[in-house]
Amino acid sequence: QGSHGVRTSYQESFNFSQWGCGTLEGIPTFCSEQMIISPVGLDNEFTALRRLGIDDPFLLLSIDPNCICATPYHMISSQLEELLLGKNPRGTIGTGVGRACRMFHESGDTLTLRAIELTDKTLIRKKLQRQCEYYRAKYDEAVKTSILPEDMAIAEDNLALLADDGYLQYCLELFEAIGKRLKFMDLPEALCQAGTAIVECSHGVLTDAGMGFSPHVSAIRTLPKYTNEMLRTAGYDGRIINLAVHRAYEIRHGAGPMPTYDRNFTEAMLPGSHKDENRWQGIVRAGALDLNLFRYALECCKETPIDGLCLTWFDQIIKNNRIWPICSAYEGKTSIDKNDVDFLKNTACPVIQEHAIPQTSNDFELFRVVKEILRQYIELPLTML
């Protein structure tokens, strides 16, 4: 729900967070009630998709009426919470998804806005007002006493929005406009549509609230067993194929352990991306594919075993002199230095092997080479799509 970067076979690129990754191919999206939608995100993404030539993106979108809405007030809370951590970052995208989830678990529907309520102007105003008042009471004093001096300007800008009636009115009007465009559907109805349903999950396994590396985790559960339970509860009794999706290298935007982080590799893979950092999410880091973390992620999923691997972004390896670095083990004592400027950089040394990818324009030959390399390290089916 931060964004999924997609490049189509005809070289169109887009970052999706509300619509599914198949939108540019005309594939419709259904947001289940486990999805936390953002009316602001919907508005922004709608405008961007229109620029790409999709006349009305909302015709390709249906939403469960029970979806929780992340509001600008959740976004403000997310960013302030990170600033309050000072020099001990947890890391957050800063869009309010986690805060919306936590608010629901703490306060239920008293403060939480549901997708179906976007059709009721009175309810929108009431719940936005309640959220605003809740966060003003929570942060007014905390910001004055606990924010680092260098973060005070950002914090004060966020507090000002909590006190701005004009901002509340802006949110109300935007939410009401989005509510008029939404098409509602529940999961059983969505599963009755013709074709194959692809369930696109929004967070990695290692950000799972229960199995990830705390505190650098999401507020939600990200394991495939929860997706499978959702489908079974809806009455689906057919075949489910669980696919792991992973880049050909490691990437992390923000705080958290990342043993293979390499500044030079980051610049080679994502030139200039480190300049896109913000205070609450932090820097973009990339490094060698870490099969130690990958094996742990597979272990986390053992209740619902993974059937195969989708390896993505391999075109960047090709562009990087066809050298594919892979880490399969660590050397030395594995420990964490919490004062490290590189955000909990592992003090153990990753053992990295570099694999040369032969010059070839044949996709099938490339797939064969990649498959043979991975077979040295993991036992998991790899299929070319």
Predicted regions and their residues:
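Non-transmembrane, aqueous-exposed alpha-helical and coiled segments at domain scale
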Residues: 1-385
